Swiss-Prot record:
Residues bearing PTM Phosphoserine: S11
Family membership: Belongs to the RecA family. RAD51 subfamily.
Location of the protein in the cell: Nucleus; Cytoplasm; Cytoplasm, Perinuclear region; Mitochondrion
Keyword DNA repair (UniProt): yes
Subunit structure: Part of the RAD51 paralog protein complexes BCDX2 and CX3; the complexes have a ring-like structure arranged into a flat disc around a central channel. The BCDX2 complex consits of RAD51B, RAD51C, RAD51D and XRCC2; the CX3 complex consists of RAD51C and XRCC3. The BCDX2 subcomplex RAD51B:RAD51C interacts with RAD51. Interacts with SWSAP1; involved in homologous recombination repair. Interacts directly with PALB2 which may serve as a scaffold for a HR complex containing PALB2, BRCA2, RAD51C, RAD51 and XRCC3. Interacts with HELQ.
Region (Required for Holliday junction resolution activity): 1-117
Record GO cellular component, one term: cytosol
Residues where ATP binds: G116, V117, P118, G119, V120, G121, K122, T123
InterPro entries: DNA_recomb/repair_Rad51_C, DNA_recomb/repair_RecA-like, HR_Repair_Mediator, P-loop_NTPase, RecA_ATP-bd
High-level lineage: Eukaryota, Metazoa, Chordata, Craniata, Vertebrata
Name by which UniProt lists this protein: DNA repair protein RAD51 homolog 3
Keywords annotated in UniProt: ATP-binding, Cytoplasm, DNA damage, DNA recombination, DNA repair, DNA-binding, Mitochondrion, Nucleotide-binding, Nucleus, Phosphoprotein
């Protein structure tokens, strides 16, 4: 049964314009593209995107479901939810220390935010994961595909070629120690050409294009059911530079976050969001904190913070519903994202970082 627009949490002004333009139900509106809706109704593109986000989110949330299912009114027990957690799967990072503190790797059905200053390794991890998500199941992978949404132009296909080549070589070494025919058969399809052809790349130049692309993702994922990873590399960039209205920015970001959570649950995939760091002045000290403010800090299920300590890269698991807070060193090599060589100095630094981060500072609205 179709639900009339009066039953949705839209502003009276927008609802009135929709009705005046002949729209009666949410289904009528959801069939229209954001740019067409803006022209037809006489509202801004931002209002059109926000309206479509609200309607799509409400249509999803008004259908009770188990996590990862799409059957309306289906009931779940706590035991079934626990079993889903145990069988949800992980995408390995090729850094065993990071995989360990995450409980096995980047989890499916959850959103993970990776924060850090430029050059610390956020995009490197994203490109590594876009390759790793395609590792065959017999090698411990999930045999999926990846969507890569780039807002800053940081994606480097030559680097992906290097990462994919190293991954293929690594799996061939593993297969050499196994006599099972399954491993050799899987490697026939795990080629450089196939890896690159299963990374779907989208370049978004501003927040309007980003929101529109996120809005279109459910249909894309329905057409590409093997996608197990969605990456937005640079969530803060378009909102910090193109949008001055903070209240509108907050609403759009909240809508985007809810959309990504729905995608993770409904399509049983992992979501990666990278975020920049900003400077906060507190008690005459300059502190680096994740951008987009404290409210955005609740958007993702898991938050990782990458940072430098002297010349060593570190990853801190800052927020997780199931794993304790931890800090580990890592390195970026020509082959990709890897474990760091642990030294006495780095171990001492790691201990001090674990102690220091217990005293948390709230993120600044930026």
């Amino acid at each position: 049964m179709q639900r009339e627009l009066v039953g949705y949490p839209l502003s009276p002004a927008v609802r009135g314009k929709l009705v005046a333009a002949g729209f009666q139900t949410a289904e009528d509106v959801l069939e229209v593209k954001p740019s067409e809706l803006s022209k037809e109704v006489g509202i801004s593109k931002e209002e059109a995107l926000e309206t479509l986000q609200i309607l799509r989110r409400e249509c999803l949330t008004n259908k009770p479901r188990c996590a990862g299912t799409s059957v309306a009114n289906e009931k779940c027990t706590a035991l079934e939810l626990l079993e889903q957690e145990h069988t949800q799967g992980f995408i390995i990072t090729f850094c065993s220390a990071l995989d360990n503190i995450l409980g096995g790797g980047i989890p499916l059905m959850k959103t993970t935010e990776v924060c850090g200053v430029p050059g610390v390794g956020k995009t490197q991890l994203c490109m590594q994961l876009a390759v790793d998500v395609q590792i065959p199941e017999c090698f411990g992978g999930v045999a999926g595909e990846a969507v890569f949404i780039d807002t800053e132009g940081s994606f480097m296909v030559d680097r992906v070629v290097s990462l994919a080549t190293a991954c293929i070589q690594h799996l061939h070494l593993i297969a050499g120690t196994h006599t099972e025919e399954e491993h050799q058969k899987a490697l026939k399809d795990f080629t450089l050409e196939n890896i690159l052809s299963h990374i779907y790349y989208f370049r978004c130049h501003d927040y309007t294009e980003l929101l529109a692309q996120v809005y279109l993702l459910p249909d894309f994922l329905s057409d590409h059911p093997k996608v197990q990873l969605v990456i937005i590399d640079g969530i803060a960039f378009p909102f910090r530079h193109d949008l001055e209205d903070l209240s509108l920015r907050t609403r759009l970001l909240n809508g985007l976050a809810q959309q990504m959570i729905s995608l993770a649950n409904n399509h049983r995939l992992a979501v990666i969001l990278t975020n920049q760091m900003t400077t906060k002045i507190d008690k005459n000290q300059a502190l680096l904190v994740p951008a987009l403010g404290e409210s955005w800090g609740h958007a993702a299920t898991i938050r990782l913070i990458f940072h430098w300590e002297q010349k060593q890269r570190f990853a801190t698991l800052y927020k997780s519903p199931s794993q304790k807070e931890s800090t580990i060193p890592f390195q970026i090599t020509p082959q990709g994202f890897r474990d760091a060589v642990v030294t006495a100095a780095s171990s001492q630094t790691e201990s001090s970082l674990n102690f220091r981060k217990r005293s948390r500072e709230p993120e600044e609205e930026c």
